[in-house]
């Protein structure tokens, strides 16, 4: 029996900088602690230990100009460049190729004037909502150029918040051109849509075809249940198990992974770097490992960890099986 792909989507990573702390509505966790503004590299190393041990694959963002604090090539405000380089080297050598690397546009904060590098008044997603391909193409191009200079091989992009949703046709046309101009790739993917509980299950779909180029939409199908670790100091085993239960219960019979699997969905499991880092405690990384253990125990004969690049290749190789855009395009209530 052909196994179902399972992929871990990790939004918002950047060298040390917490882009979430920069754009959060409040500078405090729900239990009143200050949100930390940087995540030490040790948390990345712990994450790598887990994904290597359990064979986890998926998508991992690298925000090129995180929180409008500079860029990952020329330096980030208040961050030691040696630590930035250490972070980038770790991602290049330990996160890839299991995870497909993507920009999450330029800053995941304020839109950027690409001529000056300075922040514009509007948040990136708000700015993008009124743009077309003539302005989106150079914007996406700049994000790809920075990651290419950082020696990342990129085949797709991630939308910060719902970047491009209101002008999706223009957005994906811009992405296709930018990807071809920077990397020479005719096929690429993007992550924008969050869909869950859709009858028949959700799979990637062909979103754009023109000039022998193709763009694939890869949706997410779960909430980010690791998020609650940001707002708690609990690190005990009972709490870890509770968080993991949302994805897959200890007996392998419940949780959103099981629910979506029974529907027939590709299992694209959503989380954020800040959720795994848990305001510095790394509780989310421990919960992720518990989820991975349960997947191994109960689903190893039904699912296989898959990178987004592999999902792209599968979709392109059998386009006719992936042309149907889901009828239900409901947006789930998820925190970014």
Predicted regions and their residues:
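Active-site beta->alpha N-cap acidic-glycine motif
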Residues: 1-97, 142-146, 152-159, 269
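Active-site-adjacent pocket scaffolds in enzyme catalytic domains
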Residues: 7, 19, 78-80, 89-90, ...
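A cross-domain feature marking catalytic cores of carbohydrate-active enzymes
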Residues: 10-12, 60-64, 103-107, 158-161, ...
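A short, flexible beta-alpha/helix-coil linker loop
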Residues: 15-16, 67-68, 108, 274-277
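Short, flexible helix-coil linker/hinge segments at the edges of structured domains or between repeats
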Residues: 23, 107-133
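Acidic-and-aromatic substrate-binding clefts and catalytic sites of carbohydrate-active enzymes
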Residues: 35-42, 64-86, 113, 132-137, ...
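Secondary-structure boundary elements
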Residues: 53-54, 133-155, 177-186, 297
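C-terminal domain-boundary segment and adjacent tail
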Residues: 179-205, 253-257, 262-336
